């Protein structure tokens, strides 16, 4: 089995693959203060709850945008799974030309998403990932990574609003009954949901105008289904796109 780990600034997503089949997946908080023992015990508990045997893990692949956690995660893998992990980074065989001014600047998660999306759809694409930051990654019809856009994430916007406007509460990110809110909570939700949908659709329209081929827009991340349900541009949702990309890159670099 393959253990795939996607370390984001806010959450870490873990998946266990048996061949090409995603057997189980979990989302946990990314913590800078956990020791490798604490991460190891947490994963052992998750495996036990799913009836999975840690000894069956034959390889580990990690994409991380949190460099300080690299040593901790490596030690966790060695001590609790007896496996040295493969980290996504420069020099890895991606099968995708990275047409960025400095390819080393492209986050591991963005490369992984691009590889997974092109492997599945084989066309011009925009991948929108709703994480701590909302990222837009553009892939040409020939399978080249062209670049993209980075925006503040939904959670960051919610936190900033609640912190900076003392009379406005932090609300659940949920679709309101109408874009015209009838109370404070619904008004904030309308601004967040429809504001982000407007941003996504607007950026995707601008990207499409610059490309020779109209792109398919794919969304991933925990909030992708909600946004996609309102967006006019998003046509596909794959919440496990990053994990699938990790599996593909592991296969290409074994």
UniProtKB/Swiss-Prot annotation:
Catalytic activity: (R)-pantothenate + ATP = (R)-4'-phosphopantothenate + ADP + H(+)
Cofactors, names only: NH4(+); K(+)
EC number: 2.7.1.33
Binding sites annotated in the UniProt record for K(+): 129
Protein family according to the UniProt entry: Belongs to the type III pantothenate kinase family.
Residues that coordinate or bind substrate: 100, 107-110, 184
UniProt keyword ATP-binding, yes or no: yes
GO cellular component, one term: cytoplasm
Compartments (UniProt record): Cytoplasm
Keywords noted in UniProt: ATP-binding, Coenzyme A biosynthesis, Cytoplasm, Kinase, Metal-binding, Nucleotide-binding, Potassium, Transferase
Source organism of the structure: Anaeromyxobacter sp. (strain K)
Residues annotated to bind ATP: 6-13, 132
Enzyme class: transferase
Its biological purpose: Catalyzes the phosphorylation of pantothenate (Pan), the first step in CoA biosynthesis.
Primary localization: cytoplasm
Pathway: Cofactor biosynthesis; coenzyme A biosynthesis; CoA from (R)-pantothenate: step 1/5
Subunit structure of this chain's protein: Homodimer.
Record flagged with keyword Ribonucleoprotein: no
Active-site residues per Swiss-Prot or TrEMBL entry: 109 (proton acceptor)
Ranges that cross the membrane: none
GO molecular function: ATP binding; metal ion binding; pantothenate kinase activity
Designated gene of the protein: coaX
Protein name, entry field: Type III pantothenate kinase
Details of cofactor binding: A monovalent cation. Ammonium or potassium.
BP-aspect Gene Ontology terms: coenzyme A biosynthetic process
Domain of life: Bacteria
């Amino acid at each position: 089995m393959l253990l795939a780990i996607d370390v984001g600034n806010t959450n870490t997503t873990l998946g266990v693959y048996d061949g090409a089949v995603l057997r189980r997946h979990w989302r946990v908080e990314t913590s800078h203060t956990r020791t490798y023992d604490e991460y190891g015990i947490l994963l052992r508990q998750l495996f036990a709850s799913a009836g999975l045997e840690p000894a069956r893990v034959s390889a580990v692949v990690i994409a991380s945008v949190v460099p300080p956690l690299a040593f901790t995660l490596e030690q966790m893998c060695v001590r609790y799974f007896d496996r040295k992990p493969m980290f996504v980074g420069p020099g890895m065989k991606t099968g995708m030309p990275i047409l960025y001014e400095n390819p080393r600047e492209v986050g591991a998660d963005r490369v992984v998403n691009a590889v997974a999306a092109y492997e599945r759809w084989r066309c011009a694409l925009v991948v929108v990932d709703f994480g701590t930051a909302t990222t837009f990654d553009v892939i040409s019809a020939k399978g080249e990574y062209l670049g993209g856009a980075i925006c503040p994430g939904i959670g960051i916007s919610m936190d900033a609003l609640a912190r900076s406007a003392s009379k406005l509460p932090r609300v659940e990110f949920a679709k309101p009954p109408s874009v015209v809110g009838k109370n404070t909570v619904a008004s904030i939700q309308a601004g967040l949901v429809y504001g982000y949908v407007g941003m996504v659709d607007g950026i995707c329209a601008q990207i499409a105008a610059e490309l020779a081929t109209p792109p398919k827009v794919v969304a991933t991340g925990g909030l992708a289904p909600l946004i996609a349900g309102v967006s006019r541009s998003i046509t596909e949702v794959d919440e496990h796109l990053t994990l699938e990309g990790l599996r593909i890159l592991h296969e290409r670099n074994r």
